[in-house]
Structures are given as structure tokens and as C-alpha cells.
């Protein structure tokens, strides 16, 4: 149950009944401090201002008609007109019981929508690097959350699998194949192959001529060029899949929807935009001038959709892509997890899409932009030599560091167990360090911080789960077979239950805002509150058996909530560390 939404609805009804216009926001939020209750309604002052009345007097009118029977034990007016709401212990205990008995921990499924999520999007014939990490793991965490809420999510890995660079790559692939008879499906160093192709293109005019011819042939559907192109895509995606699997990212080959998918749509898009009077010829090119965007002279900005040589641009592809996602995939909502530097480009493409009538206004197009990963020097994260860090190398280093950490903490574990724990901790640390930061901000990549067992880190959260789970090992009981009822005898118990029951609010916020850090913050706060509860409220040596069973239930709900929350982030838990 989303308690915040329930109270918000009740307060909204009361505000309207007290004389405010329908739809006046109640602005119910979680209280910052326990002295202000569990929730606080902040919309009273805005409503009073609209009505031209005293806020505290209006707050009293709202309280007179507010029905929170069976939910709140107390309500009070605070400050200039806030309403503080204190949840009743009976309500909290009953909701905690219901959550523990539910495989979904009380999280309701939403009315299902079809949601397309565009994330990861590496380029063909290039290895994934750290710049792909944020889109890949942020997108995947949001996708998992949306699916948990019952939505149909279509993963779209919009890989860069088309363009003039494929001429030189195919020409080089052909050269290698002629020399060795067959190209290894490994092509272990894609970057080296790409650099070699570029060098040949720049230095060998005959090679460059062949490459240019292959671009034309590929665009014309030449069977040989298509076969070579497909081989390059296959080699790249096999390597990318290894990174996805290591990171526990849910993308597969079936989710690839590359730029090439939309090639056949592009001529028709241009023709249609011309017919609708949106695209006009300008210096031989087809251009859409947008009043919504101005150039430095204050004139409508021109967006080229077809070059004078007949070639199409990324914008043309993005228009076709958005159209396809609505018309063919039936999207109600489309999420783009793309670098913040692409914002204007996307906004221009979407403006054209709306003007052309390809997607109605009730379909949401959302750019979930993200900042950069920085080194300790505050600059983009690079190798010591100043090069781009390959994602596979980053994951290898994470594994080595985690292995050394586990070795130092638990040398008595078997080699197999150490390796398993190190791998789980390493991938979790890399992901959580990113996911725990606000998506739109840059963040500093710091090995020491991300592998620390203190603070808002993956090792801390994984250990928090292990610690809670160990209670049941010590008790010799299964957390799924507990008896008795949850009861509240201490403030720390009430605080823990109140936080546990905010899980659905965190889940829905991540789904709505595309911000996984909300879940990280929630889980970190929950772990801290459980720690306070654990120290203040003895579980296994509780003074009464009924209290022991109640506290075991609270520990079980905490363990399940942490495990489920981390699973939505694509992070595994461990039974022991």
C-alpha cells in the first residue's frame, strides 16, 4: 500500500470539502522529523491563499472534515498551516503483517502501460567503455522497477550499427578474411581493428576508394556488404553481452533495435514532412525550421533532415524511431536514457515528431539525462595514459580489488566462496556507486569509497542484508515460517515499521522519475533504522515469546525489503560475507 498516496487522497477530499477548488494539491510528504508526525500536508497554505483566508483557520476547517479513521492516531496544525499526521500503531502493525504475508511486500501493481526504454546503445565495432555504464545500469534499474509494477516494458538497445564508417570496416574485414581465410568471431580487440581500418582509410587511397564504394553498396543492399556488416554486428554484440551478463543487466541480443532498423522509413519521413509543409529546401538540403529553437541571431533554428547529397542524419533516424515506437510498438511512454549533451538534439526531433502528428500529446517522451563519470581530478574518467577506460577492464579491476578485500576480511573461506563473494560484491559496488548518485549530476569514481563497508555503498547494503539474515540462522528458524502477530512496544519498532511501509513510495518514485538513487537512499535509511532497532530491541532474548516473534517478523520484512530493493537495482545479495 502507498500510504502517502492514501493520505494525499483523503486530505485532497477534505481540502475540497472545506471550500477549495477541486484538484487543489494536498502536497502530502513524509515528515522530516518524528516530532512532526509520519506525514505532513503542505498544501493548506496554497489553498488558503487562493481563497483569501487565514491558513491556520483553513487548516482547522480541513481537519474538521478530514477522515483518517483507522489510519492516524493524531493530527495537529503546525506553524503557519501545516497539518502533521501521526499514524496509529494498530494501522502500522496491520500493514506490516499484510506486507510480510505478500510476496510483493504490499506493493500494488499499477494499471499496465506499454513502455519503451532506450538504453545502453553502444557502437558497433567499438568496445564498450565507461561512458556506456551510466545509461546501461540506470536504464536497467528503471526497467526492472517498471516491470515489478506490472508494466509491459520493451527494452530498446539503439546500437550505432549504421553510417559511413562501415565502408572502411567492411573493406578491412574483407582484407583480413582474404589474408587468413576466415575472420575469428572473437576479434578480441575491436578498438585495434577500428583504429587499423581508420589508418588504412587515411593513408591508402585505393583502400579509401574501396571503402567509399562499399558505403554505397551497403546502403543499396549489396549481399556481400550486408554479410560483412552483419558479421561486425555479431562480433560486437557477443562481446557486449559478456559485459551485460557480468553486470547482471537484463539486455539480450533480442533487445537490439539499431539505427539500421529505420533505414527504409527515412525517405518516406522526408517526403511526408515536405508534404506537410514542415520541411523546406534550403541550399539543396531538406530543413525543418523550428520557432521553438533560436539560433544566435534569434532566428528559428534549422534542423537538417536530408543533406544535399541525399544522405540522412541522426535526427531523421530519431524521428523515424519515435514514430515506430508509437505506431508499431504501441508505446504509452518512451524513456530515453541518453547523455545530457544530447538534450537539444532530442528535443528538436521530438518537436518535429509532434508537429508532424506522428505521436499524440498523451504519449510521454522523456529524456532521462545523466551526468558524467569523473576521475578524482574532477575530469572525465580516463586511464593513466589519458585513454578511454574499457568497461571490461574496469570490471576486471573491480573484481581484483573485491577479491583482495574479501581475502583480508575472511581468509578462512574456501577459494570458491571467496571468488563468488568477490564477484558479487565487485559488480554491486560498480553499479551502486553510480545508481546511488542523483542521475543528472556528475560523480567522482572512487574505488576506496565504492568498496567501503561504511556509508551508502553496495558492500554496506549487502552486509546489512547478511546481518539481518543471520538473525534467523542464529535462531534456527525460517523467516518464511514465523508465528504470532506484529506488535509495537517500543518507539524503535514503530520507526522501523513506518520506514518499511514506505517501500512502495520509493518504488513508484523510481518508476515515475527514472531516478534509481531514490531506492538507494531508501534502502540506506532503512538499514540505519534497522541497526538502531537491533541495538535497542533484543530479538532472540526478548522478555516475552510474543515480542520475540513480533521482532523476528520485523527482521524478516526488513531482509525481504532490502533483498527486493537491491534486486530492482540489479544487485544480488549474499547469505554470508
UniProtKB/Swiss-Prot annotation:
Residues spanned by motif 'HIGH' region: 122-132
Gene3D superfamilies from the UniProt entry: Arginyl tRNA synthetase N-terminal domain (3.30.1360.70), HUPs (3.40.50.620), Isoleucyl-tRNA Synthetase, Domain 1 (1.10.730.10)
GO biological process: arginyl-tRNA aminoacylation
SMART domains found in the cross-reference section: Arg_tRNA_synt_N, DALR_1
Principal subcellular localisation of the protein: cytoplasm
Catalytic reaction annotation: tRNA(Arg) + L-arginine + ATP = L-arginyl-tRNA(Arg) + AMP + diphosphate
Keyword Aminoacyl-tRNA synthetase carried by entry: yes
UniProt-listed InterPro entries: aa-tRNA-synth_I_CS (IPR001412), Arg-tRNA-ligase (IPR001278), Arg-tRNA-synth_N (IPR005148), Arg-tRNA-synth_N_sf (IPR036695), ArgRS_core (IPR035684), DALR_anticod-bd (IPR008909), Rossmann-like_a/b/a_fold (IPR014729), tRNAsynth_Ia_anticodon-bd (IPR009080)
Superkingdom of origin organism: Bacteria
Example GO molecular function: ATP binding
NCBIfam families to which the protein is assigned, alphabetical: argS (TIGR00456)
Name assigned to this protein: Arginine--tRNA ligase
The organism of origin for this protein: Vibrio cholerae serotype O1 (strain ATCC 39315 / El Tor Inaba N16961)
